[in-house]
C-alpha cells in the first residue's frame, strides 16, 4: 500500500474541491481514507492514504487524455 494521488486513465488525477468526495473515492478503491490536496503539484486533486498497490496512481509525466 502507499499514500499517493489516485489516477484516472492516462495518468490524470481526480480533480476535486471537497474532502468528502476524495474520501469516498479513495475508500471505494480500497484506501484507508482520502483528502482534498489543495494547491498541490497536480492542482486541486485527491490524495489517498494507504491506497492498494493494484490501484493506479499519478506518476511523473503529463495527463494524456484521448
Swiss-Prot record:
PROSITE patterns: LCN_CSAB
Signal peptide range: none
UniProt entry keywords in alphabetical sequence: Disulfide bond, Ion channel impairing toxin, Neurotoxin, Secreted, Toxin, Voltage-gated sodium channel impairing toxin
Post-translational modification: Only three disulfide bridges can be formed, because only seven cysteines are present.
Keyword DNA damage: no
Keyword Transmembrane helix tagged: no
InterPro entries in the cross-refs: LCN-type_CS_alpha_beta_dom, Scorpion_toxin-like, Scorpion_toxin-like_sf, Scorpion_toxinL, Scorpion_toxinL/defensin
Subcellular location: Secreted
Gene Ontology biological process terms, A to Z: defense response
Tissue specificity of this protein: Expressed by the venom gland.
Cellular compartments per GO CC: extracellular region
GO molecular function, one term: sodium channel inhibitor activity
Disulfide cross-links: 12-63, 22-46, 26-48
Domain LCN-type CS-alpha/beta: from-to ranges: 2-64
Pfam family, one: Toxin_3
Family of this protein: Belongs to the long (3 C-C) scorpion toxin superfamily.
Function: Binds voltage-independently at site-3 of sodium channels (Nav) and inhibits the inactivation of the activated channels, thereby blocking neuronal transmission.
Free-text note on domains in this protein's UniProt record: Has the structural arrangement of an alpha-helix connected to antiparallel beta-sheets by disulfide bonds (CS-alpha/beta).
Protein name: Toxin Boma6e
Organism this protein belongs to: Buthus occitanus mardochei (Moroccan scorpion)
Amino acid at each position: 500500500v502507499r499514500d499517493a494521488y489516485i489516477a484516472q486513465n492516462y495518468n490524470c488525477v481526480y480533480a476535486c474541491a471537497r474532502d468528502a468526495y476524495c474520501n469516498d473515492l479513495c475508500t471505494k478503491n480500497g484506501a484507508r481514507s482520502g483528502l482534498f490536496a489543495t494547491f498541490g503539484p497536480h492542482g486541486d486533486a485527491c490524495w489517498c492514504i494507504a491506497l492498494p498497490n493494484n490501484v493506479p496512481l499519478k506518476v511523473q509525466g503529463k495527463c494524456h487524455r484521448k
